[in-house]
A protein has these predicted regions:
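Active-site phosphate/pyrophosphate- and oxyanion-stabilizing loops and adjacent acidic/basic residues
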Residues: 44, 127, 162
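Short amphipathic alpha-helical/adjacent loop interface patches that line ligand
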Residues: 66, 130, 158
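Major-groove recognition helix of helix-turn-helix-like DNA-binding domains
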Residues: 99, 123-132
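Short Lys/Arg-enriched helix C-cap and helix-to-coil transition segments
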Residues: 137-144
Length: 175
């Protein structure tokens, strides 16, 4: 099959590590950490579903995303307004939609997320959907922590998750 579309990608250097930003059309479809062991899977899924190839380039939405990330890391942005293209299963999109309702400076457990989407026994599935998030930070999966307040897995690594939560003023957790 010949790819008919192009996913434009460029590197972004954050204070927490290198990321790849990607856009398809006028929407951001990728914001992944280079340390993400599932990152290649996300790229393959995007290429297959969008019938597109990856191309190192930039776009208006990528530059807007980079500018908003700069503001976020400088402590001047709490909410993002970059248009997103979320590619995943219906369940994943439900979880990601609920993640976007978790405000800056707040955390939830995976169990709380499962309850919020009406699937209280689907804690593991929620964790898996969280881990499959193709647009980290914009869909704030870093705000989900263990029920014991531990920092559990994160595509950018536990250190990046800790630094993001410190930036948002919620780490260490005050019990």
């Amino acid at each position: 099959m010949i790819a008919r579309g192009v996913i434009k990608t460029r590197l972004y250097e954050s204070p927490c590590g290198t990321m790849t930003l990607g856009s398809f059309g006028d929407k951001l479809c990728l914001c992944k950490w280079h340390t993400d062991k599932h990152g290649e899977l996300a790229c393959r899924r995007l290429k297959r579903i969008l019938n597109a190839c990856l191309e190192e380039d930039t776009s208006g939405v990528i530059e807007k995303a980079a500018a908003q990330l700069n503001e976020f890391f400088a402590g001047r942005r709490r909410v993002f307004d970059v248009p997103l293209l979320l590619i995943g299963t219906d369940f994943q999109k439900t979880v990601w939609g609920e993640l976007m309702n978790v405000p800056f400076g707040k955390t939830l457990s995976y169990g709380e997320m499962a309850r919020r989407i009406g699937r209280p026994k689907a804690v593991r599935a929620v964790a898996n959907a969280n881990g499959a998030n193709p647009v980290c930070i914009f869909v704030p999966c870093h705000r989900i922590i263990g029920s014991d307040h531990s920092l559990t897995g994160y595509a950018g690594g536990i250190d990046a998750k800790r630094r993001l939560l410190e930036l948002e003023g919620v780490w260490p957790i005050k019990i």
